[in-house]
Amino acid sequence: MKRVVVLLVFFLVSFALYAATVTVVYLDRSETNLEASSYIKKQGKSNKLPHKFSFASKFSALKGDEKVVVILNSGRSSGTDPRISAYLDTVGNKQTIILVNLYSIGKNILSGSVKSANSDFGVDEISAATQWEDRAGDVQAMHKQWTAELFRLIEIKQAL
């Protein structure tokens, strides 16, 4: 019995050490970014994903060897934060990047994705609403939808 417990602990520690890390970059400590980061982490745990999430508040924190980088683009009604655009213009390997656009778009509950081939930046993109006037809409369902798409893209990128 003791050997089984030791072996189980060994496997759990090994799995934790070798779990793939996904870096989430947010440029501002806005309520939207903090909630989105928290939601990603919470949904990752509830879906029992084998990834560890690390969070960075600036691009300079990236080492360059990340397998997957998620960039949160928020605080806008449309378009991309100029700091994100500038960073994406300099990145060599865009295959590792997922851009998550969290827009304030009024009444619409939007959740959609764009493949890298169709993206202006050459990266996979997900767009979702952060707030809307129609409070009758199911907020949790919308957030679950964009995080499910995010996790699907992470799985694909981890396999590359």
Residue spans for each PLM region:
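Sec-dependent N-terminal signal peptides
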Residues: 4-13
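A general structural motif
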Residues: 19, 65-66, 94-95
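FMN-binding flavodoxin-like domain, especially the glycine-rich phosphate-binding loop
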Residues: 22, 71, 79-160
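Short, well-ordered secondary-structure micro-motifs within conserved domains or adaptor modules
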Residues: 61-76
